[in-house]
């Protein structure tokens, strides 16, 4: 039967997405202008719900296309203006530069990071110790790098391990070509392969949680941290200090959770590395060490020095985060002899789709600002006083971040609280405390689902997920103990007064200085 033009259109529209999803998006595009004509406020909220729906369906279709179409239509029918969208992009240029340059910069440091993580797995035999090392190492790296970058590195490590084992177990040598996605090789022991997959799933989930534990601590750990820091006019060290009353107890709670789930082998954890696999990986590491040339050793040394520059540059805020990332690209490529344009271009492939998606987020944020969608919610939350207000903001951010991307949630809330500050509804000191509640609320409970954390979504949609049988449901189940512990410890740190008391102590000892409203007004604003 010949294909009609309408069938061809539906087939082409959003590619391989399910038909019901395509119809849903087309329905949204038809309904939205009608609702906007009848009631702009309801239409605005409908757009936000639709956009969250596209994020939740990220595995069916990358959210850039359906979310982007909704955003374009919103601008076209007057829900916001192109100038307001551009203003949002302008206000968040540093975040865009972080994603473009920092993620690409770390691409050129992968050799060093692969070397370090390989040593961890081959030298340490205790699964509990390896799990803790992966979790802590990911947390440390995420405090200085974007969590997406860290997960990208650890995925590369896991794919490397998997392909090495698969190749040797299929009867080939390290140097042979091999398709590690095919399990049709009769030499493969399925029990061994299944156990190894479980082991890699465990390590990737511990590393993913580690990125959340470290990412919440500093202004560069997650994109929304940078947005919050810009609105509050905080620098690197001040941001880390203000977060510490919540982030330090949460970090230790996370590490204890890592130990307990491995010790008692619950929620899918506790999978051991089979002895045969360990032997293969150790032999590979020895093979690499034996064949490492002076050129290779110099490259590792250069990457270590660049890593040191990265930490120092960020800690002392020697330049904006994106520019430090650009300097990493230039130095890592110049001193390691990477001068081919195509080789450099590969570094940008991982982050640019997400950067484009972030630009669409800001278009939706522009609609929220112009239609004043969050004003009733914010006014309700602000009607409470002191500590209760902080707890409500933490919970409100946390619940929304579980189903929607935390960059989106954090951006919306900090913009609204900033507006309340500039209109005189709250004091500057209360604004600073609310900024901490918003940052921790968006970062910690969002580990619940891949929708909330960009790094988790990146892991779920990566090449490694199908190889190690890591599905959406399995990720949610494995993240559950962490979700419960991190969320509860975070809310208790605020509810029991640790945040207010420690912040006051920092003021009293002059480790922190009070900011004025003028500081915030002078900071980059989304209004």
UniProtKB/Swiss-Prot annotation:
Keyword annotations: Antiport, Cell inner membrane, Cell membrane, Ion transport, Membrane, Sodium, Sodium transport, Transmembrane, Transmembrane helix, Transport
GO MF annotation list: sodium:proton antiporter activity
Keyword Ion transport carried by entry: yes
Transmembrane stretches, start-end: 28-48, 52-72, 97-117, 130-164, 203-223, 248-268, 304-324, 349-369, 390-410, 448-468, 476-496
Predominant place of localization: membrane
Keyword Cell membrane listed: yes
Coiled coil: none
Catalytic activity: 2 Na(+)(in) + 3 H(+)(out) = 2 Na(+)(out) + 3 H(+)(in)
Organism: Shewanella sediminis (strain HAW-EB3)
HAMAP family, A to Z: NhaB (MF_01599)
Cellular-component GO terms for this entry: plasma membrane
Membrane topology: Multi-pass membrane protein
PANTHER family recorded: NA(+)_H(+) ANTIPORTER NHAB (PTHR43302:SF1), TRANSPORTER ARSB-RELATED (PTHR43302)
Function noted in UniProt: Na(+)/H(+) antiporter that extrudes sodium in exchange for external protons.
Family, similarity comment: Belongs to the NhaB Na(+)/H(+) (TC 2.A.34) antiporter family.
Designated name of the protein: Na(+)/H(+) antiporter NhaB
């Amino acid at each position: 039967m010949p294909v009609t033009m309408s069938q061809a259109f539906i087939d082409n529209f959003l590619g391989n997405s399910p038909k019901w999803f395509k119809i849903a998006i087309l329905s949204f595009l038809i309904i939205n202008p009608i609702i906007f004509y009848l009631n702009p406020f309801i239409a605005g909220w409908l757009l936000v719900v639709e956009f969250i729906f596209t994020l939740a369906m990220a595995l069916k279709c990358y959210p850039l296309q359906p979310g982007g179409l909704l955003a374009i239509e919103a601008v076209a029918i007057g829900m916001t203006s192109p100038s307001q969208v551009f203003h949002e992009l302008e206000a968040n240029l540093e975040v865009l530069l972080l994603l473009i340059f920092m993620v690409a910069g770390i691409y050129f440091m992968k050799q060093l990071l692969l070397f370090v993580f390989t040593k961890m797995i081959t030298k340490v035999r205790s699964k509990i110790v390896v799990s803790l090392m992966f979790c802590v190492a990911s947390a440390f790296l995420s405090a200085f790098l974007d969590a997406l970058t860290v997960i990208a590195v650890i995925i590369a490590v896991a794919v490397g391990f998997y392909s090495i084992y698969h190749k040797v177990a299929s009867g080939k040598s390290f140097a042979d070509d091999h398709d590690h996605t095919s399990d049709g090789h009769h030499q493969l022991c399925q029990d061994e392969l299944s156990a190894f997959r479980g082991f890699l799933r465990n390590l990737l989930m511990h590393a993913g949680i580690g990125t959340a534990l470290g990412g919440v601590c500093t202004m560069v750990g997650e994109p929304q941290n940078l947005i919050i820091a810009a609105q509050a006019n905080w620098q690197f060290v001040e941001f880390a200090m203000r977060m510490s009353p919540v982030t330090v107890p949460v970090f230790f709670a996370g590490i204890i959770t890592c130990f307990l789930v491995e010790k008692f082998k619950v929620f899918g954890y506790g999978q051991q590395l089979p002895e045969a696999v360990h032997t293969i990986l150790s032999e590979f590491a020895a093979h690499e060490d034996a064949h490492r040339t002076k050129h290779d050793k110099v490259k590792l040394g250069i990457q270590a020095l660049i890593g040191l520059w990265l930490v120092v540059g960020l800690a002392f805020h020697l330049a904006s985060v994106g520019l430090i990332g650009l300097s990493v690209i230039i130095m890592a490529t110049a001193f390691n002899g990477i001068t081919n344009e195509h080789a450099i271009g590969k570094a940008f492939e991982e982050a640019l789709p997400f950067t484009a998606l972030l630009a669409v987020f800001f278009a939706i944020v522009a609609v929220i600002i112009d239609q004043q969608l969050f004003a009733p919610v914010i006014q309700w939350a602000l009607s409470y006083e002191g500590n209760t207000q902080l707890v409500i903001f933490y919970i409100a951010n946390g619940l929304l971040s579980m189903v929607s991307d935390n960059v989106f949630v954090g951006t919306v809330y900090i913009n609204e609280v900033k507006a309340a500050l500039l209109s005189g509804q709250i004091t500057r000191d209360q604004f600073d405390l609310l900024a901490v509640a918003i940052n921790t609320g968006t970062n910690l409970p969002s580990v619940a689902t891949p929708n909330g954390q960009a790094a988790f979504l990146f892991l779920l949609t990566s090449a490694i997920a199908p190889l190690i049988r890591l599905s959406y449901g399995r990720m949610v189940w494995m993240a559950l103990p962490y979700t419960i512990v991190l969320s509860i410890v975070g809310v208790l740190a605020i509810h029991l007064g640790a945040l207010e008391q420690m912040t006051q102590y920092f003021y009293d000892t002059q480790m922190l200085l009070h900011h004025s409203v003028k500081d915030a007004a002078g900071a980059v604003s989304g209004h």
